[in-house]
Every structure is written in structure tokens, then in C-alpha cells.
């Protein structure tokens, strides 16, 4: 997060994260995953997810989502947050704040005995009450020995559906929120996913553990 500032390239951020992950004795999960060429996904402005780090220079007013996966001791953690690059618009800041808060609204229902869709219902209800859209084309997921495991965890839908959560489950909860329409488009590189209307998007994610009480957050995205 501290590296998100005007004049920095997305590739420089990726390199710093790569070196940090290795310094902790972990492996960057994304690197080579499905052929992905980097250790992080860095998604700027209208890019929602899966932005490929490169020579793009960040500028004042950009919003920048950094998504990171690391594998250590056989377990994979997946997390993301969206950061302001310098001074951003009030509406862009609201989008970032609502996206992060929607994660916390969702995990109020990430408890033993509740159903998976209770999380997404809470996320969608909160996000839409704030005037934003929730991406449907991509969802959260189970996480553990592999990065993507069952069950899928949508950020939308009716409550009371899907498997019941049980103690010991590990889930990646990741609201992807748009300023306008929730429709998306994947670019020719087959990775970069943008809002169809070109408006801003934000992403926030942590991996959590279902316990017999409140869920435990396993990844900490503050400052990433």
C-alpha cells in the first residue's frame, strides 16, 4: 500500500511484493497459476481484477487494487485491498470505503450453521444501499491447500442457500464493487477484467476461518 503513489509502475509494486513473499519463506501463489505472469494482480481504476503488472505509471487520482496470494507451510492465503494514489475524488474514496466495509458486513454471517449465501446477501444489500453495484461474474471461494477450492462464495443473491458453514472451513471473501453497472468485460490478454461501462471498481479480500464464534481473519490487508 505504501508503494501506491504517483510515478511508480505496477511492475515495481509486483517486484516488491514478490521479494517480500520470498523473504518470509513463502511462495507467490499467483506466479504461473493458469499461466499468470506475475506475483500480484494490480488493477487500476476501471480494472476490477486480474490486472497484469507492467510499465503502467500510476498517477495522482488513480485507485489501485493489489491482490496477493502466498503459500506457506502447505496453506494458501489470498487477500486484496484497493488503495488511493495521492489525492482521489470523494466518490472514488467512498467506493473504496464501501467495498472494504461490505467485507465486514458479509462476515457477520460467516458463522457455523449459517449458509454460504447469507454472506453474499449481506454484501449485496449493503453495497446497493450505498448506490454501488456488485460484480456477478466472479466470486469468492474456499481456500486452503489450493488457492481455489469449493465452495464458491458469491457476493450477491438470496439468503439461506448453499452449504452450511462448519467450524474449520477456510474461505476467501472478496467483494468486487463497481461505481456503475456490474457488467464486466475481459480484455484480449484473457486476464484483465474491466467494468463494461468504464467506471471505477474496487476490490477487498481476506481469507477467513469459520470457528464456533466470530470468524477469524487469517490475512491482514492493512497496508498489505
Question: What does each of the following model-derived ranges do?
Answer:
Residues 1-224:
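Active-site neighborhoods and metal-handling regions in enzymes and metal-associated proteins
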